[in-house]
Amino acid sequence: MAARREPSSDDESYEVLDLTDYARRHHWWNRLFGRNSGPLTEKYSVATQIVIGGVSGWCAGFLFQKVGKLAATAVGGGFLLLQIASHGGYIQVDWKRVEKDVNNAKRKIKKEANKSAPEINTLIEESTDFVKKNIVVSGGFVGGFLLGLAS
């Protein structure tokens, strides 16, 4: 016959699970995308973060350069065509009315600029927080962006 054991104090102890600590350590994106998703500073080394930021910055700068050239060409070409049409007598420009409209637009812009929207302030604060938290990636992005513009 087997001997009956008295439960020891170790057998009766239970582990208390703190769910707030668990939620802090296991973000929602870990459940959605897996364990390897999350902020870059938690996942990758500094060198990898710089490379990721630099490559993405270079791509953005290169595209910005190409699109910027295309936009500048389109705007410049439009002004050139307007000047040719004006010189040829096809169109008449009322410069006094243009000046009046430009001055009205300046006044409206100054009024609106003095009233900064709370959405803009929130966006600026969020952007600043992101850059502070991911300073290595942000630095790599800026460097890559400048290289992309130069190439």
Curated annotation (Swiss-Prot):
<feature type="transmembrane region" description="Helical">
    <location>
        <begin position="71"/>
        <end position="91"/>
    </location>
</feature>
<feature type="short sequence motif" description="YXXL">
    <location>
        <begin position="14"/>
        <end position="17"/>
    </location>
</feature>
<comment type="similarity">
    <text>Belongs to the FUN14 family.</text>
</comment>
<dbReference type="GO" id="GO:0005741">
    <property type="term" value="C:mitochondrial outer membrane"/>
</dbReference>
<keyword id="KW-1000">Mitochondrion outer membrane</keyword>
<feature type="transmembrane region" description="Helical">
    <location>
        <begin position="44"/>
        <end position="64"/>
    </location>
</feature>
<keyword id="KW-0496">Mitochondrion</keyword>
<protein>
    <recommendedName>
        <fullName>FUN14 domain-containing protein 1A</fullName>
    </recommendedName>
</protein>
<dbReference type="Pfam" id="PF04930">
    <property type="entry name" value="FUN14"/>
</dbReference>
<dbReference type="GO" id="GO:0000422">
    <property type="term" value="P:autophagy of mitochondrion"/>
</dbReference>
<dbReference type="GO" id="GO:0001666">
    <property type="term" value="P:response to hypoxia"/>
</dbReference>
<comment type="function">
    <text>Acts as an activator of hypoxia-induced mitophagy, an important mechanism for mitochondrial quality control.</text>
</comment>
<keyword id="KW-0072">Autophagy</keyword>
<feature type="transmembrane region" description="Helical">
    <location>
        <begin position="130"/>
        <end position="150"/>
    </location>
</feature>
<keyword id="KW-0812">Transmembrane</keyword>
<keyword id="KW-1133">Transmembrane helix</keyword>
<keyword id="KW-0472">Membrane</keyword>
<dbReference type="InterPro" id="IPR007014">
    <property type="entry name" value="FUN14"/>
</dbReference>
